[in-house]
Protein backbone atom coordinates (compact mmCIF):
# COMPACT_ATOMS: atom_id res chain seq x y z
CA UNK A 1 0.00 0.00 0.00
CA UNK A 2 1.18 3.52 -0.74
CA UNK A 3 -0.33 6.92 -0.06
CA UNK A 4 0.12 10.35 -1.63
CA UNK A 5 -0.25 13.40 0.61
CA UNK A 6 -0.56 16.76 -1.09
CA UNK A 7 -2.34 20.04 -1.72
CA UNK A 8 -2.25 23.24 -3.71
CA UNK A 9 -0.17 25.60 -1.57
CA UNK A 10 -0.28 29.39 -1.35
CA UNK A 11 1.19 30.02 2.05
CA UNK A 12 3.69 31.95 4.15
CA UNK A 13 7.07 30.33 4.73
CA UNK A 14 6.55 30.26 8.50
CA UNK A 15 3.24 28.42 8.39
CA UNK A 16 4.45 26.08 5.64
CA UNK A 17 7.42 24.99 7.74
CA UNK A 18 5.11 24.15 10.64
CA UNK A 19 2.83 22.30 8.23
CA UNK A 20 5.71 20.19 6.93
CA UNK A 21 6.79 19.43 10.48
CA UNK A 22 3.37 18.01 11.25
CA UNK A 23 3.44 15.89 8.08
CA UNK A 24 6.94 14.64 8.89
CA UNK A 25 5.75 13.52 12.31
CA UNK A 26 2.76 11.51 11.12
CA UNK A 27 2.88 7.85 12.05
CA UNK A 28 3.16 6.08 8.70
CA UNK A 29 2.23 2.40 8.30
CA UNK A 30 3.37 2.20 4.67
CA UNK A 31 5.04 4.17 1.89
CA UNK A 32 3.87 7.78 2.07
CA UNK A 33 4.94 10.27 -0.60
CA UNK A 34 3.98 13.90 -0.89
CA UNK A 35 3.47 16.36 -3.71
CA UNK A 36 2.49 20.01 -3.72
CA UNK A 37 1.51 22.53 -6.36
CA UNK A 38 3.21 25.73 -5.21
CA UNK A 39 0.69 28.31 -6.35
CA UNK A 40 2.50 31.62 -6.83
CA UNK A 41 4.75 30.52 -3.94
CA UNK A 42 8.11 29.61 -5.53
CA UNK A 43 10.09 30.40 -2.36
CA UNK A 44 8.56 27.37 -0.65
CA UNK A 45 10.48 25.07 -3.00
CA UNK A 46 13.58 25.32 -0.81
CA UNK A 47 11.80 23.27 1.87
CA UNK A 48 11.01 20.40 -0.52
CA UNK A 49 12.80 17.80 -2.59
CA UNK A 50 12.72 18.38 -6.37
CA UNK A 51 10.27 15.50 -6.88
CA UNK A 52 7.85 16.84 -4.27
CA UNK A 53 6.52 19.91 -6.05
CA UNK A 54 5.66 21.74 -9.23
CA UNK A 55 5.24 25.49 -9.54
CA UNK A 56 1.84 26.81 -10.59
CA UNK A 57 1.96 30.45 -11.68
CA UNK A 58 -1.18 32.48 -12.31
CA UNK A 59 -2.02 36.18 -12.50
CA UNK A 60 -5.07 36.36 -10.25
CA UNK A 61 -4.83 38.01 -6.83
CA UNK A 62 -5.70 36.40 -3.53
CA UNK A 63 -6.21 38.42 -0.36
CA UNK A 64 -6.51 37.49 3.29
CA UNK A 65 -6.33 39.42 6.56
CA UNK A 66 -7.23 39.04 10.23
CA UNK A 67 -10.94 39.02 9.41
CA UNK A 68 -11.12 36.32 6.77
CA UNK A 69 -9.86 35.03 3.41
CA UNK A 70 -11.34 36.70 0.33
CA UNK A 71 -12.06 34.10 -2.33
CA UNK A 72 -13.03 35.02 -5.88
CA UNK A 73 -14.38 32.68 -8.53
CA UNK A 74 -11.05 32.70 -10.34
CA UNK A 75 -9.26 31.59 -7.14
CA UNK A 76 -11.61 28.63 -6.83
CA UNK A 77 -11.10 27.72 -10.48
CA UNK A 78 -7.35 27.48 -9.99
CA UNK A 79 -7.62 25.45 -6.78
CA UNK A 80 -10.13 23.10 -8.41
CA UNK A 81 -7.81 22.53 -11.35
CA UNK A 82 -4.83 21.80 -9.09
CA UNK A 83 -6.81 19.40 -6.90
CA UNK A 84 -7.92 17.53 -10.00
CA UNK A 85 -4.28 17.34 -11.10
CA UNK A 86 -3.48 15.72 -7.74
CA UNK A 87 -6.21 13.15 -8.43
CA UNK A 88 -4.56 12.42 -11.78
CA UNK A 89 -1.18 12.07 -10.10
CA UNK A 90 -2.67 9.67 -7.55
CA UNK A 91 -4.07 7.41 -10.25
CA UNK A 92 -1.08 7.53 -12.57
CA UNK A 93 1.33 6.97 -9.69
CA UNK A 94 -0.42 3.80 -8.58
CA UNK A 95 -1.32 5.16 -5.15
CA UNK A 96 -3.97 3.43 -3.08
CA UNK A 97 -5.02 6.62 -1.28
CA UNK A 98 -4.75 10.36 -1.67
CA UNK A 99 -4.74 12.48 1.46
CA UNK A 100 -5.52 16.13 0.88
CA UNK A 101 -4.25 18.35 3.70
CA UNK A 102 -4.64 22.12 3.40
CA UNK A 103 -1.38 23.93 4.06
CA UNK A 104 -2.57 25.78 7.17
CA UNK A 105 -3.51 22.59 9.05
CA UNK A 106 -1.35 21.02 11.75
CA UNK A 107 -2.01 17.30 12.23
CA UNK A 108 -1.77 15.04 15.25
CA UNK A 109 0.79 12.23 14.68
CA UNK A 110 -1.95 9.58 14.76
CA UNK A 111 -4.15 11.25 12.16
CA UNK A 112 -3.21 9.12 9.17
CA UNK A 113 -3.33 5.80 11.02
CA UNK A 114 -6.70 6.69 12.54
CA UNK A 115 -8.19 7.58 9.17
CA UNK A 116 -6.90 4.34 7.66
CA UNK A 117 -8.34 2.33 10.54
CA UNK A 118 -11.77 3.84 9.84
CA UNK A 119 -11.72 1.68 6.69
CA UNK A 120 -13.88 4.06 4.65
CA UNK A 121 -13.36 5.12 1.02
CA UNK A 122 -13.80 8.76 2.09
CA UNK A 123 -13.01 9.96 5.61
CA UNK A 124 -11.92 13.36 6.92
CA UNK A 125 -10.36 14.54 10.16
CA UNK A 126 -12.20 17.33 11.93
CA UNK A 127 -10.88 20.80 12.60
CA UNK A 128 -12.63 23.92 13.84
CA UNK A 129 -12.46 27.41 12.35
CA UNK A 130 -13.64 30.87 13.30
CA UNK A 131 -14.44 32.16 9.82
CA UNK A 132 -14.94 35.60 11.37
CA UNK A 133 -13.11 36.61 14.58
CA UNK A 134 -16.33 37.11 16.55
CA UNK A 135 -17.99 33.85 15.44
CA UNK A 136 -18.14 30.50 17.18
CA UNK A 137 -15.86 27.87 15.61
CA UNK A 138 -17.48 25.55 13.09
CA UNK A 139 -16.19 22.25 11.69
CA UNK A 140 -14.99 21.29 8.23
CA UNK A 141 -18.13 19.22 7.68
CA UNK A 142 -21.84 19.77 7.28
CA UNK A 143 -25.03 17.74 7.05
CA UNK A 144 -26.92 19.35 4.19
CA UNK A 145 -26.69 21.79 1.31
CA UNK A 146 -23.99 24.46 1.49
CA UNK A 147 -23.25 24.54 5.22
CA UNK A 148 -26.35 23.38 7.11
CA UNK A 149 -26.29 21.31 10.30
CA UNK A 150 -28.77 19.10 12.10
CA UNK A 151 -29.62 20.41 15.56
CA UNK A 152 -27.23 18.18 17.50
CA UNK A 153 -24.38 17.77 15.01
CA UNK A 154 -22.03 20.47 16.30
CA UNK A 155 -22.15 19.17 19.87
CA UNK A 156 -21.92 15.55 18.69
CA UNK A 157 -18.82 16.17 16.58
CA UNK A 158 -16.99 17.64 19.57
CA UNK A 159 -16.88 14.11 21.02
CA UNK A 160 -14.38 11.52 19.75
CA UNK A 161 -15.99 9.26 17.20
CA UNK A 162 -16.68 8.48 13.56
CA UNK A 163 -19.72 10.20 12.07
CA UNK A 164 -21.51 10.07 8.74
CA UNK A 165 -21.77 13.57 7.26
CA UNK A 166 -23.24 15.23 4.21
CA UNK A 167 -20.07 16.96 3.08
CA UNK A 168 -16.49 17.56 4.14
CA UNK A 169 -13.00 18.39 2.89
CA UNK A 170 -9.64 20.08 3.48
CA UNK A 171 -8.19 17.23 5.57
CA UNK A 172 -9.45 14.10 3.89
CA UNK A 173 -8.28 10.60 2.99
CA UNK A 174 -9.73 9.24 -0.27
CA UNK A 175 -9.33 5.76 -1.74
CA UNK A 176 -8.35 5.56 -5.40
CA UNK A 177 -11.57 3.67 -6.22
CA UNK A 178 -13.47 6.93 -5.63
CA UNK A 179 -11.46 8.63 -8.36
CA UNK A 180 -11.70 5.62 -10.65
CA UNK A 181 -15.48 5.95 -10.38
CA UNK A 182 -15.19 9.48 -11.78
CA UNK A 183 -15.47 11.60 -8.62
CA UNK A 184 -13.47 14.85 -8.75
CA UNK A 185 -13.54 18.49 -7.65
CA UNK A 186 -15.02 20.01 -10.81
CA UNK A 187 -18.10 22.21 -10.40
CA UNK A 188 -21.54 20.91 -11.31
CA UNK A 189 -23.26 23.09 -13.89
CA UNK A 190 -26.68 22.78 -12.18
CA UNK A 191 -25.53 23.43 -8.59
CA UNK A 192 -24.78 26.92 -7.28
CA UNK A 193 -23.07 25.96 -4.01
CA UNK A 194 -19.76 27.75 -3.51
CA UNK A 195 -16.55 25.73 -3.26
CA UNK A 196 -14.85 22.71 -4.75
CA UNK A 197 -15.29 20.61 -1.60
CA UNK A 198 -19.05 20.85 -2.04
CA UNK A 199 -18.75 19.74 -5.65
CA UNK A 200 -16.62 16.78 -4.56
CA UNK A 201 -19.06 15.82 -1.81
CA UNK A 202 -22.08 15.94 -4.11
CA UNK A 203 -20.30 13.96 -6.80
CA UNK A 204 -19.23 11.35 -4.24
CA UNK A 205 -22.74 10.80 -2.89
CA UNK A 206 -24.12 10.68 -6.43
CA UNK A 207 -21.73 7.76 -6.98
CA UNK A 208 -23.11 6.07 -3.82
CA UNK A 209 -20.13 6.86 -1.59
CA UNK A 210 -20.71 7.88 2.01
CA UNK A 211 -18.74 10.70 3.61
CA UNK A 212 -17.34 10.21 7.10
CA UNK A 213 -15.80 12.50 9.70
CA UNK A 214 -13.35 11.30 12.34
CA UNK A 215 -13.08 13.41 15.49
CA UNK A 216 -10.50 11.55 17.59
CA UNK A 217 -7.54 13.80 16.77
CA UNK A 218 -8.72 17.26 15.65
CA UNK A 219 -6.29 19.19 13.48
CA UNK A 220 -5.26 22.74 14.38
CA UNK A 221 -6.26 25.34 11.79
CA UNK A 222 -3.92 28.35 11.58
CA UNK A 223 -6.38 30.41 9.58
CA UNK A 224 -4.96 33.80 10.59
CA UNK A 225 -1.50 35.19 11.20
CA UNK A 226 -2.51 35.89 14.79
CA UNK A 227 -3.42 32.22 15.24
CA UNK A 228 -0.01 31.19 13.95
CA UNK A 229 1.65 33.62 16.38
CA UNK A 230 -0.39 32.23 19.28
CA UNK A 231 0.45 28.67 18.20
CA UNK A 232 4.18 29.46 18.28
CA UNK A 233 3.99 31.38 21.56
CA UNK A 234 2.22 28.43 23.19
CA UNK A 235 4.99 26.03 22.21
CA UNK A 236 4.14 25.14 18.62
CA UNK A 237 3.72 21.60 17.36
CA UNK A 238 5.26 19.92 20.38
CA UNK A 239 2.90 21.64 22.82
CA UNK A 240 -0.18 21.26 20.63
CA UNK A 241 0.14 17.49 20.30
CA UNK A 242 2.06 16.38 23.39
Predicted regions and their residues:
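C-terminal catalytic/acceptor-binding lobe
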Residues: 166-168, 176-177, 181-242
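Active-site-proximal specificity loops/subdomain of glycosyltransferases
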Residues: 44-95
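A conserved acidic beta->alpha catalytic loop
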Residues: 12-13, 26-29, 36-50, 57-60, ...
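Hydrophobic targeting segments
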Residues: 2-7, 23, 33-37
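Short beta-strand-to-loop acidic/aromatic patch adjacent to the donor-nucleotide binding site
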Residues: 94-106
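Conserved catalytic core of nucleotide-sugar-dependent glycosyltransferases
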Residues: 87, 108-188
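Active-site beta-to-alpha loop of glycosyltransferases that engages the nucleotide-sugar donor
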Residues: 7-21, 40-41
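Short, acidic, metal-binding catalytic loop of nucleotide-sugar glycosyltransferases
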Residues: 18-32
Amino acid sequence: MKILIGAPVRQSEEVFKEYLKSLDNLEKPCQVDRFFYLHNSPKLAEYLEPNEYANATTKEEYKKDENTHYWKSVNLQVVTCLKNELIKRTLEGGYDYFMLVDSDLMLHPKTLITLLEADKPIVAEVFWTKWQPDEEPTPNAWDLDHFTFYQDSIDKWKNPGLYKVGGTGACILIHRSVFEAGVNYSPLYNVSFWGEDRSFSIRATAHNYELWLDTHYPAVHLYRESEYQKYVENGGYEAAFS
